[in-house]
Amino acid sequence: MRSPLVAICLLFPAVVVRAATPGVSMAAVPGGSYRAVTVKASEPTREVAPFLMDRTPVTNEAFLGFVRAHPAWQKDRVSRLLADQRYLGQWAGPLALGPEAPPQAPVVGVSWFAAGAFCADRGARLPSEAEWELAAAASPKDRDGRRDPAWRQTVLDWYARPNPTRLPDVGQDAPNYWGIHDLHGLVWEWVSDFGASMLVGKEARLCGGGALGAADPLDYPAFLRAAFRSSLEGRTTTTNLGFRCVEDAAGRSP
């Protein structure tokens, strides 16, 4: 069976926000070109089709509703092939959030398999790395803020801070150019093809040299994210790793 690791310019300035899935607010991100941070500048970019992205990460409350409807994903029932022993470790119980997992805080301790199942149940999917990075390149004022030293430093400062013991609610920061919150400064997030940008053939590109392997050294935050994703397995869960869903702009995801 294929490993999850392997299985893995903007065109229009207008921002459109709609709830493609009932009760879920999503922002429209125009298509564009994306170059993986570890890919040489001489290599072609990837074209990304327009898509809809959740404005905030999935919350504890939303994921609680999912595991209630699908008991196989409850923390005391989930297969260890699909999630490690830390799965939903902040929750007080299989169907209880508790003080370390506020309802409107982002759900963490969720594996790639569980995150994908949640999105699929909604008629959505996990974003690709290209989609996520394209959306995350936007600052509050610019659709590509990566050349803004002040904004880039703000993002880097978050990566240097220790993880809080209790995560705040989602949506508390200023939205970016597309109306999306929390792409930086709250939690790391799963993508569908995690680790793919750190692979060349069958060899993983290890990141001991920091940003020296990056196609664009100024985009060091993206390199950090790619390095982090490359260390994961599909069943991995951590206390600072959550997710959000996307849908195809032309219609609901299959």
Regions found by a protein language model. Name each.
Residues 2-130, 137, 229-254:
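Extended beta-strand/loop cores of jelly-roll/beta-sandwich
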Residues 28-29, 93-230, 234-239:
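Functional-site microenvironments in short loops/helix caps that host divalent-cation chemistry
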